[in-house]
Amino acid sequence: FSRVVDVAKGAALMTGTSMNYDLSMAFTEYLPNKALAQIADACMQEVGAPKWTEEDYRLARQFLDSYDDTARKMIRDEIIQIYGEDRLEEILSKPLDSEIHPFDPNHIIQTAGSTDVGDVGYAVPTLNLRVAACCVGNVGHTWQMTAQTCSPIAHKGLLTAGKMIALSAIRTME
């Protein structure tokens, strides 16, 4: 933070202006709750991934194919990173995640994005789970993302996530 302030001061000095700042808010980093994650992982394994149909796979392939070459290259790289190069063609042919990826407390992936859940996590136990609701490698903030959120794929993902969250809440209270 202090480096950013120094950069702003330097810019003001270079332009013959002045600067001041007021720290009105800050966001705390995300604090994973491993105990809740272990409960949710067991519930996710029990509920299972959404059950996709051939029509779902066809629709997902259409969305995947609609990305430009640069995005498709990034998606291929992401698939290789998650599933391994030996499964690339399999995943591309059926580009909906049909697996529950087991929780590994030594391998917590925090993806980019903006959220205030870090602040919440310091006040109350917080859990973040991920369920497929769009094609593998989907690119956020695109028309493809918007369209997929209104599709049967997203509806199945939503229902599956709801079951996982409900079962996790029940198991947490038991």
What is each of the regions a protein language model found here?
Residues 1-174:
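Metal-dependent amide/peptide-bond hydrolase catalytic core
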